[in-house]
Every structure is written in C-alpha cells, then in structure tokens.
Amino acid sequence: MEYMAESIEHSPGHILCCECGVPISPNPANICVACLRSKVDISQGVPKQVSISFCKQCQRYFQPPASWVQCALESRELLALCLKKIKAPLSKVRLVDAGFVWTEPHSKRLKVKLTIQKEVMNGAILQQVFVVDYVVQSQMCGDCHRVEAKDFWKAVIQVRQKTLHKKTFYYLEQLILKYGMHQNTLRIKEIHDGLDFYYSSKQHAQKMVEFLQGIVPCRYKASQRLISQDIHSNTYNYKSTFSVEIVPICKDNVVCLSPKLAQSLGNMSQICICIRVTSAIHLIDPNTLQVADIDGNTFWSHPFNSLCHPKQLEEFIVIECSTVRDLKRSAGAGVISKKHTLGEVWIQKTSEMNTDKQYFCRTHLGHLLNPGDLVLGFDLANCNLNDEYVNKMNSDRVPDVVLIKKSYDRTKRQRRRNWKLKELARDRENMDTDDERQYQDFLEDLEEDEAIRKHVNIYRDATIPVESDTDDEGAPRISLAEMLEDLHISQDATGEEGASMMS
C-alpha cells in the first residue's frame, strides 16, 4: 500500500483591520488603506489653493523675490514656478509626479496635479494624488508701472554726429536690426542730429555702447543722476546717461589731414576722399590711389573735418579720360587700392556748357568714366575753404576739382529698385525735408559698394520685376542672390509707413 503525499498550498496569511475588521494582508500599521487614509492625510500642510501674480501688459509671471519671467501656458517653466510657490510644504513629503490639468486660458486658473508619498505609521508608505488650484491675479510689474508713469527708463544712450548727412545713422540702423540690438530698448527717439535709445537697466545700455564702439568709430562719456534714495536700507536709484559721439565724417566727404597724420599713413596726400565708414574711416588719395584706415583713437588724437558738405556737390561732364599706367611711388608709400583705377580727366560743369572753361584733375574713378559721362564732384577752386590745414598748404597741391562718384538717373534707379530695407520703430520729431534725399543716397551707396551691403539684410520686393544686375546706363544694382525673402513686410520701407516695419 502506498501513501500519497498531500500537496499543501501555502497562501499568504490575512489579518483583520484593527479599525473596520476587513481581512487585509499584513502591513506595518495593521490597518487597511481606506482606514489609513481616513486617519492620516499626508497632503496636510500643502495648500490646495495658491495665488500667482501675472502682468497683463508684458505677459510675465512674478517669481519671488523680485523678478518677472516669461512662461507659456502648461510649459515646464510655468510648472517649476508653480511648484516653487509650495516649495516649503513639499519639502516634508516626496514628490513623485506633477503635471497640469487642462483649464480654459481665460479662466484665470491653473490646476496642477501632484502625486506625493510619505512614511506614516510604523514605516508604512502612503501615496496620495491631489490637485492644487492656482488663482492667477493681475498685478502690474515694475517695468510696466514705470512705462505708464512716464518714468520707465533707467538708462539712455544719446548718439550724436556733427554732420549734415545721416548716412552713418542709416548704416547704423541696419546693423542694429541685423544683430537684434534693438530688442531690449524701451523707446527709440529720432532727433535732428542723432538717436536716443532708452533702456530699463544700465547693463543693457552698456551692452549697446560696446556694440556701437565695435561698428563705428566713436567715443562716449557716462554720467548718472540721483533720483531717490532710502537712508534706512542704504539703496539708491540712479538714471544713467551715455553720450556717444560718432566721428563727424561720412561717406563721400572730402577731408584734409594734418601733415603729421598724412606722413604717418605712408606720406599720402593731405586731400583725401572718405569712401566708407565702418568700424574705421576708409580714405583714398585720388592722386595716387593710396588707401588708409583711421580708427576712432587715431581720429580723436589727430582730428580733421570735412571740407564740403553734400549739398555742394556739382555735376560735371567728362570731356576726355585717360588711364594712368605707370604710377611712380615714393619710398614708404602705403597700400594701393586694387578696386580703383587712376585716371586723368578733362571735365566741364554742366552749368557752364556755354563757356569754354574746363578743369583737369586726377581721379580714382578711371575704371568707370568715359567721355560724355556725368560725374559729381566738389569745385575746390571756386569754394571758400575755411580749414586750418588747407590754409597752410601750398595752393599748387590743392586740386581744382575732386570727383566723388559717377552720376546716374535717380528716377530710373528708384523705379527699378527691386529690394527694400527694414526700419526701426522710433519716434520722430523735427524731421528735415531733406531726409528722403539722404535716404536715397544711402540706398545708392548700398548698390555701389558691396563691402557695405554685406553687413545689411536686404529683402526682395516682390512687386518689382527682376531684371539684370545693371541697367541700360550701367548703374550698379544688387543681385537677387544677395536678397532675403521677407514674409512680414507689408509696406515699403522707403515710404512714409516704413517706421512701422519691424518684425
């Protein structure tokens, strides 16, 4: 006879809950989950309703103790901000999960679902899920409050240039737009001889001053004025002013250098033409094609002025033009321009066509001029030059005429211009009636000088048909490859509504 061993199944033991008597698996507390939750609330101390401040003007949330941050709805940044509001109570429990519960954007409510754990009776760990309701309260931030009170700026940059032309400011405006340096400005104000930039902090203004020093030759002075002070906390409220002065030289200006400066630049002639102003002043000697760059420090050490202003430009017609092939260079001469050709021309004023008076001069435009072409220049022979360096020069070394650039039909150039520029949104006051002509001069400079326009964002104007890079007269134009597509421009920047064109 064989005995069969009975299979014994081991099942976990059960105990009765000490509160309600329900059979449960053994646990350190000897109590069921329902009774444990009724006796212990691990979320006690965590507020179920919290207020959070929101500025409607700038769309920012208040982050204690004194900062305002930009956060999108249901973003990680906003979730972190909400959790910081209950950071102290949450430090007593273990946060397992957190997330937003969807609410209507206009409801002024933010709901955050939290999952927490905490050790309770005899080492038992209890997990609980609950929702914290955040009430969004409107509160104006300090920056917006100062804007509404017309006391919004903490620092201002006053950019000035003592010239009759604004070419440098137009170039400066395009660089500011390209590199986004206008984003921290509260207000930009245009006056007759410059621009004012207003900032909410001194640090933003200092960053702008450093940017200006890197793109144009300039110098600045800083000052500050005490607005208020608190003797109890020893805090002071200042308004800072940065006065930035740009060198008073623009493109196409004729200048006379001091003998010492001309000698230090490679014995170049004192009478030079400014062909470009970027981070330095680029000069060319029309008699030898010698070029030199003068930075801001050199200019302020050896200052010089423009001999003529743009309104004194006169139109000449080319009678005869020849290229100078063999140019003798003296010892110690500087760099010669490879982009220009030295030429000798006979010219006559278009206003004196009924006379036989002609002028002879050398020019750096030998590669552009042909008999019959029109060219713009300054008549130094019949001009009253009030300059200390010119007065000390030998009259034989002062040219009768200095040619600046070839003249084209401006009306045709404007009609065929298939590109546009953006402009800064700014307040204007006391605008000169000559501003439009000066702006057209700047646009023509961009077409003629590739070195300048490579730093400028140029946008294609879809309303103008695409043509060749040069027109019938040979006037330079900007190629389509150099233009950008702009989907935000709705007005032409060269028109009256150009001030609002900023994306």
From Swiss-Prot:
Keyword RNA-binding: no
Segments carrying motif Nuclear export signal: 480-489
Motif Nuclear and nucleolar localization signal mapped to chain: 405-422
Subcellular location as annotated: Cytoplasm; Nucleus
Chain segments carrying region Necessary for the nuclear export of the 60S ribosomal subunit: 425-503
Keyword match Manganese: no
GO molecular function ontology, one term from the record: ribosomal large subunit binding
Modified residues (Phosphoserine): S258, S468
Keywords, ordered alphabetically: Acetylation, Cytoplasm, Nucleus, Phosphoprotein, Protein transport, Transport
Phosphothreonine modifications at: T433, T470
Main location class: cytoplasm
Any single Pfam family the record assigns to this protein: NMD_SH3
One CC-aspect GO term: nucleolus
Any one GO biological process: positive regulation of RNA biosynthetic process
InterPro entries hit by this protein: Nmd3 (IPR039768), Nmd3_N (IPR007064), NMD3_OB (IPR048898), NMD_SH3 (IPR048899)
Residues recorded with modification N-acetylmethionine: M1
Assembly and binders: Found in a 60S ribosomal subunit export complex with RAN and XPO1. Interacts with XPO1. Associates with pre-60S ribosomal particles.
PANTHER family: 60S RIBOSOMAL EXPORT PROTEIN NMD3 (PTHR12746:SF2), NONSENSE-MEDIATED MRNA DECAY PROTEIN 3 (PTHR12746)
Similarity comment text for this entry: Belongs to the NMD3 family.
Function in brief: Acts as an adapter for the XPO1/CRM1-mediated export of the 60S ribosomal subunit.
Protein name as it appears in the record: 60S ribosomal export protein NMD3
Gene source species: Mus musculus (Mouse)
